[in-house]
A protein has these predicted regions:
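Substrate-binding cleft of extracellular glycoside hydrolase catalytic domains
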Residues: 65-93
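Terminal accessory/targeting
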Residues: 1-67, 77, 95, 99-103, ...
Length: 206
C-alpha cells in the first residue's frame, strides 16, 4: 500500500493507483527533530521518500533502511536572489545537493522551484522522478503521473500538512483523501510532525 516515488511508472497504473506515497521534505531540520520523525516512521514500517537538504549523520540511518529512499531537495532561492551559497548556476546548485545524496533518483525543489530547463538538468544528472507540482486534493482532479519532454517522470503531490492547516476553508478529510483514485502523494516536513502542528498560529508562535 505504501510505495516509493521512484517506483512510479506513468504507463503502469498498478504502480500508483492503489498506493500511498509518503514524502518528507527534511527542510534543514535539527537532528533531534529529524530523529523523532525517523523513529515514528520506522515503527510504522512503511516506505518513505526523503527529500534531503543537508548532510547529517542521520542519513546513514536512513540509507540503512530498505523502506526508505533518499532524494534531493535543492534550494534555488539563494541563487535567484544573487547569493551563490549553493552554487553560481542552477547546474551547480543541483550538483551541491547530489554530492550529499549521490545516485538520487527523485527530486523536489524547496519552494517548488521548477522550469523546463530545471527538469532537463535533473534528467541529465541522472534524476528520474520530479515532485514539484502541487495539485490539492480538494480540486477533485484525477491526479496522474506523466512523462515530461525531458524524460523526467512528473509526480504531483496532493496534500501537504503546512498547506492544509494554513487554509481557512477546504480542509481535507484525510480518511476520504486516502481513498481517492489516482496518484496520492503526501508531504510532511519533520518540524510539523515533531510539533504536531494543528494551525499556522501554533507554528508561528513556537
Amino acid at each position: 500500500m505504501f510505495e516509493l516515488i521512484s517506483a512510479i511508472n506513468p504507463e503502469d497504473v498498478s504502480t500508483y493507483d492503489n498506493n500511498l506515497f509518503v514524502t518528507i521534505d527534511i527542510d534543514w531540520a535539527h537532528d533531534t527533530i529529524l530523529s523523532n520523525t525517523i523513529d515514528i516512521l520506522e515503527k510504522k514500517d512503511i516506505k518513505v521518500t526523503w527529500f534531503v537538504t543537508h548532510d547529517t549523520p542521520l542519513l546513514k540511518r536512513l540509507r540503512n533502511n530498505s523502506n526508505f529512499e533518499l532524494g534531493i531537495h535543492p534550494n534555488f532561492n539563494f541563487l535567484l536572489q544573487g547569493d551563490f551559497k549553493y552554487g553560481g548556476t542552477d547546474s551547480e546548485v543541483i550538483d551541491h545537493f547530489l554530492k550529499i545524496v549521490p545516485g538520487a533518483k527523485s527530486v523536489r525543489s524547496h519552494s517548488l522551484t521548477q522550469s523546463s530547463r530545471l527538469s532537463s538538468l535533473f534528467s541529465l544528472k541522472g534524476l528520474t522522478h520530479e515532485s514539484n507540482m502541487f495539485i490539492p486534493e480538494y480540486s477533485k482532479m484525477d491526479v496522474k503521473p506523466f512523462k515530461h519532454v525531458s524524460g523526467m517522470t512528473i509526480c504531483p503531490y496532493i496534500w501537504g500538512d503546512y498547506l492544509d492547516f494554513s487554509l481557512s476553508c477546504n480542509k481535507s478529510n484525510f480518511k476520504e483523501t486516502v481513498l481517492l483514485s489516482g496518484l496520492k502523494i503526501f508531504n510532511f516536513p519533520p518540524i510539523h510532525i515533531y510539533l504536531n502542528t494543528d494551525s499556522i498560529e501554533m507554528f508561528e508562535s513556537t
